[in-house]
Amino acid sequence: MAFLKKSLFLVLFLGIVSLSVCEEEKREGEEKEEKREEEEGKEENEDGNEEHKEKRFLGAILKIGHALAKTVLPMVTNAFKPKQ
C-alpha cells in the first residue's frame, strides 16, 4: 500500500510540474504575441498619423483655396465685365 501511495504521489507531482511548465511556456508565448501586436499597432498608428496629417494638410489647402476664390473671383469677374 505504501508503494502505491508513493507511486501515486510521484505521478501527481510530475503531472503538476509538467502542467506548470506548460503554463509558463503558454504565458511566455502570450507575452511575445502581445508584444508583437503592440509593435504592429504602433506601426499602424504611425501610418495612421501620417494619413491623418495628410488629411489635415489637404483640409488646410482647401480652406486657403476657398478663401482665395472668395477674394480673387470677384476681381476676375469685374475685370472681364464689359464696361458701359
From Swiss-Prot:
Stored InterPro entries: Frog_antimicrobial_propeptide
Function: Antimicrobial peptide that displays antibacterial, antiprotozoal, and antiviral activity. Exhibits antibacterial activity against the Gram-positive bacteria S.epidermidis ATCC 12228 (MIC=4 uM), E.casseliflavus ATCC 700327 (MIC=4 uM), S.aureus ATCC 25923 (MIC=8 uM) and E.faecalis ATCC 29212 (MIC=8 uM), and the Gram-negative bacteria E.coli ATCC 25922 (MIC=8 uM), K.pneumoniae ATCC 13883 (MIC=8 uM), the multi-resistant clinical isolate strain K.pneumoniae carbapanemase (KPC) MR (MIC=16 uM), and P.aeruginosa ATCC 27853 (MIC=32 uM).
Subcellular localization(s) per the UniProt record: Secreted
Protein name: Figainin 2
Family label: Belongs to the frog skin active peptide (FSAP) family.
Organism encoding this protein: Boana raniceps
Propeptide: 23-54
Ranges of biased composition (kind: Basic and acidic residues): 23-39
GO biological process, one term: defense response to Gram-positive bacterium
Biased composition (Acidic residues): 40-49
Region (Disordered) location: 23-53
Gene Ontology CC, one term: extracellular region
Signal peptide residues on this chain, from the entry's feature table: 1-22
Highest taxon, organism lineage: Eukaryota
Keywords per UniProt: Amphibian defense peptide, Antibiotic, Antimicrobial, Antiviral protein, Cleavage on pair of basic residues, Cytolysis, Hemolysis, Immunity, Innate immunity, Secreted, Signal
Tissues expressing this chain: Expressed by the skin glands.
Pfam families: FSAP_sig_propep (PF03032)
